[in-house]
From Swiss-Prot:
Pathways involved: Amino-acid biosynthesis; L-arginine biosynthesis; L-arginine from L-ornithine and carbamoyl phosphate: step 1/3
Key word Cytoplasm present: yes
Name the record gives this protein: Ornithine carbamoyltransferase
Keywords associated with the record: Amino-acid biosynthesis, Arginine biosynthesis, Cytoplasm, Transferase
GO biological process, alphabetically ordered: arginine biosynthetic process via ornithine; citrulline biosynthetic process; L-arginine biosynthetic process
Gene source species: Vibrio vulnificus (strain CMCP6)
Gene this protein is translated from: argF
Length: 334
């Protein structure tokens, strides 16, 4: 390997250099090709991996499980009701127990401080599957997907906008990733929902070194002009109360990704991205409740955009598995 990431935690992109992030993306692409070609080599044979989920998941759980199985590892799923973490046992103690039994641990849950403590005391690689502050494995998948749909452009040549709630874990992580990779990112949404000022300042300092550009704006037309990709996420994140919907929908409605917004990019080949799940119609319980209450079929993105040729959301979802596999192989593989 060009970089030795063995035994490293993967907790947030701030911990990794530009070259290390690019290495993980390149490794993801190689592993994806090998899986499709049937030439994959098992680098995790004999490894045991714990998957701690304090929040529900579809893509992240499936991606970790399939990636581990492909590479020859065994997994144990520990769900929200399947452990004593934080109730009868501290994370510090849990980390030291699981670290004696497992070769690697994934955590998906709440505060970043929790996964940082797990990483500090486990003694084995710990991977962040999502916290309230950061979602680093998602961003690796996003950047691999962008490269696959950029006609040979490097990441540093890509312009993209994130619309909506830019202070959530995906908005934060996209900003960090873009800064690290020297990209042009525009965070487009109400100022009250921009990322924390300290994180913005840290990313601006990184971007100054890498040649990246970070723009925060409430102006949709200004934010999306010339973009190669438009990205959005749900307006109310996991763990937030249903009461948050009324205020949030009123604030975020101008930042819905619809065909008019795509046209404002001036790029007929612009692509649409979303980390999923998405509220793009009324075919889910929550989607129907929203449609009935607000008269909107689709919130952060319209059905027309989601199902259009511009949408690459399922390529993006698949790439969760390839990039997670790369993280595990790089940090734990033989």
């Amino acid at each position: 390997m060009a970089f030795n990431l063995r035994n490293r935690n993967f907790l947030k992109l701030l911990d990794f250099s530009t070259k290390e992030i690019q290495f993980l993306i390149d490794l993801s692409a190689d592993l994806k090709k090998a899986k499709y070609a049937g030439t994959e080599q098992k680098k995790l044979l004999g490894k045991n991996i714990a998957l701690i989920f304090e929040k529900a998941s579809t893509r992240t759980r499936c991606a970790f499980e399939v990636a581990a199985f492909d590479q020859g590892a065994q997994v144990t799923y520990i769900g929200p009701s399947g452990s004593q973490i934080g109730d009868k046992e501290s994370m510090k103690d849990t980390a030291r127990v699981l670290g004696r039994m497992y070769d690697g641990i994934q955590y998906r849950g709440f505060g970043q401080a929790i996964v940082e403590e797990l990483g500090a005391f486990a003694g084995v690689p710990v991977w962040n599957g999502l916290t309230d502050e950061f979602h680093p494995t998602q961003i690796l998948a996003d950047f691999l997907t962008m490269l696959e749909h950029s006609q040979g452009k490097a990441l540093a040549d890509i312009q993209f906008a994130y619309l909506g709630d830019a202070r959530n874990n995906v908005g934060n992580s996209l900003m960090v990733g873009a800064a690290k990779m020297g990209m042009d990112i525009r965070l487009v949404g109400p100022q009250a929902y921009w990322p924390d000022e300290e994180l913005v300042a840290a990313c601006q300092a990184i971007a100054k070194q890498t040649g990246g550009k970070i723009t925060l704006t409430e102006n949709v037309a200004e934010g999306v002009q010339g973009c190669d990709f438009l990205y959005t996420d749900v307006w109310v994140s996991m763990g937030e109360s249903p009461e948050a919907w009324d205020e949030r929908v009123a604030l975020m409605k101008p930042y819905q990704v619809n065909m008019n917004v795509l046209k404002q990019t001036g790029n007929p080949n612009v692509k649409f991205m979303h980390c999923l799940p998405a509220f793009h119609n009324d075919e889910t319980t929550i989607g129907k409740q929203v449609a009935d209450k607000f008269g909107m079929k689709g919130l952060e993105v319209t059905e027309e955009v989601f199902e259009s040729e511009h949408s690459i959301v399922f390529d993006e979802a698949e790439n969760r598995m390839h990039t997670i596999k790369a993280v595990m192989v790089a940090t734990l593989g033989s």
